[in-house]
Each structure stands twice: as C-alpha cells, then as structure tokens.
A protein has these predicted regions:
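Conserved beta-strand positions in the central sheet of alpha/beta enzyme cores
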Residues: 67, 108, 137, 160, ...
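Histidine-acidic metal/acid-base catalytic patches
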Residues: 3-4, 22-43, 47-65, 181-196, ...
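Active-site-adjacent substrate/metal-binding segments within catalytic domains
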Residues: 67-77, 106-115
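Glycine-rich, proline-tolerant flexible connector loops at the mouths of alpha/beta enzymes
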Residues: 68-94
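Bacterial N-terminal signal peptides that target proteins for export
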Residues: 1-10
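Bacterial N-terminal signal peptides
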Residues: 9-18
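Active-site acidic/histidine proton-transfer and metal-coordination neighborhood
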Residues: 92, 98, 102-196, 202-206, ...
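A short acidic, helix-capping loop that chelates divalent metal ions and anchors anionic groups
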Residues: 74-81, 167-171, 203, 230-235, ...
C-alpha cells in the first residue's frame, strides 16, 4: 500500500501564528494522570461487556479515565438499560456511582452523530454536561458545524472530530484526512478539534506523527493504538510492538502541550484484552518515568 503523502497546506496557516493550544474550563485533574498524560480506555475496548464492567476493567488495567460510546449495555444486572444520551437520570446516577467506586473519571462520549437537528444534538451536549465530560467525539455532518460551534460555546463542552480509515469505495468519506478535519475547525472556536485515532491513521496510510503535526494544537483527545502492520489489515498490539511509533506520538503530543486524554481503544483479543491494555498503559508509565530521568 502506498503511504499517504502529507500535505501541510492548511496547517501552514497555523504555523504562522504559532501553536494554538486547546483550552477549556474543564481540565483533567492531575490525580487522573499517568505522568503528564490522562490515559484510560474507550469503553468500546470492552464492548462484549457492560459499561459497568468496562469501568472495572479500565481500573484493573491501570487506567484512570474512560470514554463511553452510545449503545453499550449499562450493566449485566439490567440487560435492557443502555448507556446513551437519552438514559434516565436514575441510570445516570447509577453510572456515576460505579465511576466513583473505581475512581475513574469520564472524559468523552462517542463516536456519536451530530447534525443540524438541534434537539438531538443538544441532547448530546446536555448529557455531556450532566456527566461532567470534557468533550464529545463525533464525525459530524459538515453542514452542522455552525450549530455545533454554538452548542460548544453554550455548554463549554469540546467537540472532537474522529477519523475512521480511508474508504477506497467511498471518496465522499473525508474524515480520515487530517487536512480535511483541520479545515472544518481551523477558523472556529478552539474547543473544536480532533480526536486523533492513531490506528486509523495507520490503516489509511497516514504516518501518525505527520497527522498530528497537521492538526497542531487542535488535538482534543486521541484513540491511541499500535498496529502490527501499516495497512488496512493492521490489528492492535501492545504498545512498542507495532508500527505506530508510540514514543514519537507521545513526544509530538507533548510538544503541542496536549492536555487532553488518551483513550486506549484495543480492538483485538476482545474477550480477554485486559492484560494487553495493562501492558499498553504500563508502556506509557515507563515512558513517562524514563523521560523524567533524562538529563
């Protein structure tokens, strides 16, 4: 597969004005960080389990934050209840109690659709505010960006545009391209940016560090992944064993003064991935410890 040729056309405009840092009133407290990074899981890692179990497994793996997704079963005790932005206040209280039990902070929600249907999009942001989230993660309808920006400002909740892999049979799918994502947010409120999915960059033939440089200062969160090969067929492996170059990714995020969360979305070994996830978090912990020992 030919590797994608990086284009810096849109990013160049940002370089002229220096690094743009994403700022928000909702900072992630240091107690939820491993070194300088808030790292935990995207609950989709544990999609064969309930959201309650995903919280517990995140804690078992050493994570301190979690990103939820819509549609996951809430708990194994109530198979009819789902986690989404229409869940009842009663179930939301149960979710918060489970988070408190394992001292896990919820930080994001997605990937969730956002459109010009204001009632539905507003429900997403209202849910995010109720749960105390920093951001929602979406692949929004581009024509809805004005409405989304209005809601971001009103709720002080960020919106991070996610990228799935390039779709050769669907040229209209553009979120895989960091230049396109940047074009949607570059002239808007800084609380609009990217959820940089490192694994999907690799599957699209995009070198992750190059993508992050294009998105300079607009990375709100990241789905951090190391893949076994640089192709659409790549699958997750523990950090340091693949081709994503996780150390370079972490260094680039540090250079950009990234203050968001790293969501481990481990889409392999689905039924027993906690040891692999723990190894990934341990890699970041070791990287941070080694960095602090540098002269």
């Amino acid at each position: 597969m030919k590797k994608w040729s990086v284009r810096f056309s849109v990013a160049a405009a940002l370089v002229v004005f220096g690094c743009i840092s994403v700022r928000s009133e909702s900072k992630i407290p240091d107690e939820y960080k491993t070194g300088d990074f808030a790292i935990g899981c995207q609950a989709y890692t544990f999609n064969r389990y309930s959201a309650f179990e995903a919280i517990e497994k995140t804690a078992q793996a050493g994570g301190k934050v979690i990103e939820f997704y819509p549609g996951q079963k809430l708990s194994k005790d109530d198979p009819t209840a789902k986690l989404d932005h229409h869940m009842s206040d009663e179930n939301l209280a149960k979710l918060k109690a489970q988070l408190d039990k394992f001292h896990i902070k919820p930080v994001n929600y997605g990937v969730v659709g956002l459109s010009n249907n204001e009632q539905e999009s507003r429900a997403v942001f209202e849910f995010a505010r109720k749960l105390g989230l920093r951001a929602v993660t979406s692949e929004p309808q581009p024509e809805a960006m004005d409405l989304i920006e209005k809601l971001v400002k009103e709720y002080d909740v960020m919106m991070a545009i996610h990228n799935h892999p390039k779709q050769p049979r669907n040229p209209n799918y553009k979120f895989w391209d960091p230049n396109y994502v940047l074009s949607l947010v570059a002239n808007r409120d800084r609380r609009l940016g990217s959820c940089a999915d490192i694994g999907h960059f690799v599957r699209s033939g995009v070198k992750p560090v190059d993508a992050l440089r294009i998105l300079n200062g607009r990375v709100i969160s990241s789905h951090l992944k190391d893949l076994n090969e640089f192709s659409p067929r790549g699958h997750d492996v523990p950090f340091g064993l693949g081709v994503s170059d996780i150390p370079a990714v972490l260094e680039e995020l540090r250079r950009q003064h990234f203050d968001g969360n790293l969501s481990l979305e481990y889409e392999y070994n689905w039924d027993a991935s906690v040891p692999d996830v723990a190894q990934c978090i341990g890699f970041v912990r070791g990287y941070e410890a080694h960095r602090k020992m540098r002269p």
